[in-house]
Amino acid sequence: MSLVKLESSDEKVFEIEKEIACMSVTIKNMIEDIGESDAPIPLPNVTSTILEKVLDYCRHHHQHPSPQGDDKKDEKRLDDIPPYDRDFCKVDQPTLFELILAANYLDIKPLLDVTCKTVANMIRGKTPEEIRKIFNIKNDFTPEEEEQIRKENEWCEDKGGN
């Protein structure tokens, strides 16, 4: 069992099995490019707190692989988040967004999918006003601009007549 050292942006070093670290396409490519080395692989876009959570996620999914399904079909489903992943994503918003950024940077598609699905579920069925409140977004549209946008997009509003 070969170990790899990863260094977070705040200079904390983590040792992890190479096979688990390579769940990240970014890390896998770095290992292939620089070869085996005792020097830690720098991850300047990921803090130690977030890297620790990402590595926990990777360890779990290495030990308990998800069944392979129809990826295209599963990508579009928002209600099929496995229990471990659902619990993993029960974090405060800033942490959830940091996990999304880390999953994207590290190229860990399953983690990116589950964190993005979690955000999608947070806004599903919400009005623009509710979404602004959830994410603390200031409404910088004038009432006239809002009305214009509503008129331009009324074709896509749910009229409740399904």
Swiss-Prot record:
Post-translational modification: O-linked glycan consists of linear Gal-Gal-Fuc-Gal-GlcNAc. Not glycosylated in prespore cells.
A Gene Ontology BP annotation from the UniProt entry: protein ubiquitination
Keyword Cytoplasm: yes
Localization annotation: Cytoplasm; Nucleus
Xref: SMART domains: Skp1 (SM00512)
Glycosylation (residues): P143
Subunit text: Multiprotein complex (SCF) with cullin and F-box-containing protein. Capable of undergoing aggregation.
Protein name: SCF ubiquitin ligase complex protein SKP1b
